[in-house]
Amino acid sequence: MSLPPEKASELKQLIHQQLSKMDVHGRIREILAETIREELAPDQQHLSTEDLIKALRRRGIIDDVMKELNFVTDSVEQELPSSPKQPICFDRQSTLKKTNIDPTRRYLYLQVLGGKAFLEHLQEPEPLPGQVCSTFTLCLHYRNQRFRSKPVPCACEPDFHDGFLLEVHRESLGDGTRMADSTTMLSISDPIHMVLIKTDIFGETTLVASYFLEWRSVLGSENGVTSLTVELMGVGTESKVSVGILNIKLEMYPPLNQTLSQEVVNTQLALERQKTAEKERLFLVYAKQWWREYLQIRPSHNSRLVKIFAQDENGINRPVCSYVKPLRAGRLLDTPRQAARFVNVLGYERAPVIGGGGKQEQWCTLLAFLCRNKGDCEDHANLLCSLLLGYGLEAFVCVGTKAKGVPHAWVMTCGTDGAITFWESLTGHRYIHKPTNPDEPPVAEQPKPLYPYRTIGCVFNHQMFLGNCQPSDAVETCVFDLNDESKWKPMSEEAIKSVCAPGATTSLPPFPPLCASTIDASVTSNEIEMQLRLLVSEHRKDLGLTTVWEDQLSYLLSPALASYEFERTTSISAGNEEFQDAIRRAVPDGHTFKGFPIHFVYRNARRAFATCLRSPFCEEIICCRGDQVRLAVRVRVFTYPESACAVWIMFACKYRSVL
């Protein structure tokens, strides 16, 4: 529903007043602090956490608190990015939902209280009510918890005002049900990973910044409250350039019975940094020695793509094995092939580079890749390998080249029977590898490879790294017996474990869990279909043609679209016979039927329509001339985790042939 600008402005003001009356942040402070601390008499303030909980249970206060502790959070925080998102207007009231908080657990309340010095947006005009504009969204991950801020208009001083309640707990040693004390929390080295995403007016996403927040300074602050100024740096080639500043406030709930001295906190952090630096130094020394030995096998190895380290979005060199980890998708993905389809529908985009030259290297951390919903081939391969490892397969990322020597990464799985399967993460295609023998006589028939890969330099996963030391690095002649050290030179698994195992170093970004889609497939399918009908009608009107839609014919296209997606997910074709039979019955004798299916991984109808018109066959259908022309279009959106989606569109027409 569109509103006049004056009405939209009035509605926006009323919403703002109502949210101010609710005082969300104040309610969090008052209920937790007063209920848990001030309800006890002053002489009992020395009680331990266990005694405090027992006293609250005896008095029945916990039951009351569980009923009363309802905090209002914006449901947009729980949404995940998609590619692309619908443009955002700022004259609509957000949907609010309530969340319960357990007063027996320890929480870190992180507030983002505005931003400043985002100088790239210095001249950005303030958006008018109802105007579509570019937005910033802040995504957070901490110990398997993910959050997302409300989108705010891009500005020099973006109006971030969000609060995130992060549960702090130990997940092992039987401490999962105990409230963490200061000493326990000091030993939890996981940082808070913050990713800033920009979404333009067309729904395209850009990674602006990726920052790891060290939150434990709050443990040495008075009353467990501290304020920080976080300077966000750019990504890739701009990783040394400041993009903006965020004002952040950290509070512990319930308040700490005992705060640590700042000196103790600083000493712990310094010790962790020192241990991490020493482990990384020792691994670097080992990697150099391994590389020297690899070159001594054959000097030509120097030209092979043996990738031991790779730069992340912040320009930090990390061992490639740290980009992969067994990842379980819970109930979001059922099979390895469905996982491959999910990775395939995430957008592909090479890292941006300023000026000409070669490819810019940027292997994104998993959170940055998921929040942006697109990345390079290495990002896709790392995610697919992690998911396949989670399904119990022996999976590796392969680094090599495609045709014309273009660097590329893909995934390989090794079966228990020795079968080697390549998985192309950008398309979801699978290829069986059967090596050719270069010593066979020319007359011998050799299997022709169907895969697009030409050379392979190394393979790796979270535990192993192996360099290809066979006489030729051509994939078609490669033997993938990874236990044969005459063909594959391994790195020490202990050395890899020292820097890549979970918790081995504090510099390792933790892996976030996948989140379910927030897209309503039926609603989105219908919206895109209606937009395409309008675009087709306008296009035909410009050509002087009338448009008559046939709803029944449109409906009959649905089984075909479902069949196409099923085939992409399972590699099995099904249901085509019923579709063809239905179409034959729907098209009268003497009439001609034409259909054009096409697949996208974005939900922008206008962009999809422009792409379709570039196909001569599709243009022939859309611009069909003849007797009794009836047009049909069907859209089917298939949703996947992280709000990724596969969009299938089929245009069709039937007309009476006049010759």
Swiss-Prot record:
It is found in: Cytoplasm, Cytoskeleton, Microtubule organizing center, Centrosome; Cytoplasm, Cytoskeleton, Microtubule organizing center, Centrosome, Centriole. This is Centrosomal protein of 76 kDa. Centrosomal protein involved in regulation of centriole duplication. Required to limit centriole duplication to once per cell cycle by preventing centriole reduplication. Belongs to the CEP76 family. Coiled coil: none annotated. Interacts with CCP110 and CEP97. One of its GO terms (biological process) is regulation of centriole replication. The modification Phosphoserine is found at residues 75, 83. It comes from Homo sapiens. Keywords: Cytoplasm, Cytoskeleton, Phosphoprotein. The keyword DNA damage does not apply. The keyword Transmembrane does not apply. InterPro entries: CEP76 (IPR052299), CEP76-C2 (IPR028926), CEP76_C (IPR056288), CEP76_N (IPR056289), CEPT76/DRC7_peptidase-like_dom (IPR056290), Papain-like_cys_pep_sf (IPR038765). GO terms for cellular component: centriole; centrosome; cytosol; protein-containing complex.
